[in-house]
């Protein structure tokens, strides 16, 4: 997600999602825990303990949240690393996953100690996932552009592995929107209202219970 007209204090994916989680009603942002690379170097044992306390026994996803990645000023979606389905019952797996995400920063020559690692509860029962632009990315035409995959994996679109495409006219009557996409459109409208812009790029997942 990179809202491009929001408050300048949002410098990362973690900052943006933390703000949105407190505001969003129609959709859901999974539980969040984030920390900086410097925090990890200073006391990774405490971070591991806090992560387990917060998410146990659920599985988690460990995600990159570099300064400038999916922020107000720029987007680097898919540039770094995300690791899914990490058990909170095995400390070593958690530690290794965080180390991999941090290593990806180094490999991309971004060693900012204020880069973050974002941990969220792993969404379950996903049936559709993808990335949606709230206007066409090339010229801003009034269409929702939805790149999607009907898969339980939540990152195969951002990785470029699978992508189907549908466009929905922003001003069309709601009754003609395919049922599959109605809830997503309602959530997008709420997010646009929260950030006061209709130029957004948002990763999404839809569950069997139609939770977005």
Q: What are these regions, as identified by a protein language model?
A:
Residues 1-212:
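Nucleotide/phosphate-binding sheet-loop regions of phosphoryl- and nucleotidyl-transfer enzymes
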């Amino acid at each position: 997600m990179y809202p491009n007209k929001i408050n300048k204090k949002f410098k990362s994916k973690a900052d943006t999602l933390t703000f949105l989680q407190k505001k969003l009603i129609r959709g859901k942002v999974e539980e969040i825990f984030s920390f900086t690379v410097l925090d990890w170097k200073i006391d990774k044992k405490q971070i591991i303990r806090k992560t387990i306390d917060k998410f146990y026994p659920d599985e988690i996803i460990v995600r990159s949240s570099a300064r400038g990645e999916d922020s107000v000023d720029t987007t680097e979606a898919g540039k770094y690393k995300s690791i899914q389905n990490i058990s909170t019952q095995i400390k070593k797996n958690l530690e290794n996953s965080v180390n991999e995400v941090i290593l990806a920063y180094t490999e991309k020559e971004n060693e900012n100690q204020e880069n973050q690692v974002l941990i969220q509860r792993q969404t379950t029962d996903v049936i559709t996932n993808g990335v949606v632009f709230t206007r066409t990315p090339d010229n801003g035409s009034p269409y929702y552009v939805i790149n999607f995959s009907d898969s339980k994996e939540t990152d195969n679109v951002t990785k470029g592995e699978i992508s189907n495409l549908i466009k929905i006219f922003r001003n069309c009557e709601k009754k003609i929107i395919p049922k599959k996409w109605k809830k997503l459109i309602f959530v997008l409208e709420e997010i646009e209202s929260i950030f006061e812009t209709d130029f957004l790029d948002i990763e999404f997942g839809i569950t069997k219970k139609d939770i977005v």
